[in-house]
UniProtKB/Swiss-Prot annotation:
Gene name as annotated: rplM
Transmembrane portions of the chain: none
Keyword Ribosomal protein: yes
The name this protein goes by in its record: Large ribosomal subunit protein uL13
UniProt lineage: Bacteria, Bacillati, Bacillota, Bacilli, Lactobacillales
Organism of provenance: Lactobacillus delbrueckii subsp. bulgaricus (strain ATCC 11842 / DSM 20081 / BCRC 10696 / JCM 1002 / NBRC 13953 / NCIMB 11778 / NCTC 12712 / WDCM 00102 / Lb 14)
Assembly behavior: Part of the 50S ribosomal subunit.
InterPro entries for the chain: Ribosomal_uL13 (IPR005822), Ribosomal_uL13_bac-type (IPR005823), Ribosomal_uL13_CS (IPR023563), Ribosomal_uL13_sf (IPR036899)
Length: 147
């Protein structure tokens, strides 16, 4: 009987991808990034091994929210004090801190365990055009071709 070859962490070659988020829907961007971070686009994907690549997202402030998500989608967090429930709409978060909006969206699509946290750390989001990862020679990736 043959066994499926499982990927080992030492054998995985990681690439760096650069994604421009200008006029891209938040959901489409997040699903594509989560797929790359998990490594599901690779033939040697193994669920219990971090096989994903590094992703750099630029122009997060130019994202597009479709429908009524700018007003109706609410993000909650609590200060741990009584009555400390805070809420902010997706439109307000996009205007104030677009990096946080992308991070929350992608983090919700990754596993809720230590492997998911390890995969999340390979994502680098920037609100503007500039980023500090030129030394890694990232490969430009078009989101429209992935989905």
């Amino acid at each position: 009987m043959r066994t499926t070859p499982l990927a080992k962490t030492s054998e995985i070659e990681r690439k760096w991808y650069l994604i421009d988020a200008t006029d891209v829907s938040l959901g489409r961007l997040s699903t594509a990034v989560a797929t790359i971070l998990r490594g599901k686009n690779k033939p040697q994907f193994t669920p219990n091994v971090d096989t994903g690549d590094n992703v750099i997202i630029v122009n997060a402030s130019k994202l597009k929210l479709t429908g009524k998500k700018a007003t109706d989608k609410i993000y909650y967090h609590h200060s741990e004090y009584r009555g400390g429930l805070k809420s902010v709409s997706a439109g307000e978060l996009l205007a104030k801190n677009p990096v946080k909006l992308v991070e929350l969206s992608v983090k919700g699509m990754l596993p809720k365990n230590t492997l998911g946290h390890q995969e999340f750390l390979k994502m680098h989001v920037y609100a503007g055009e500039e980023h500090k990862h030129e030394a890694q020679k990232p490969e430009k990736l078009d989101i429209n071709n992935l989905i």
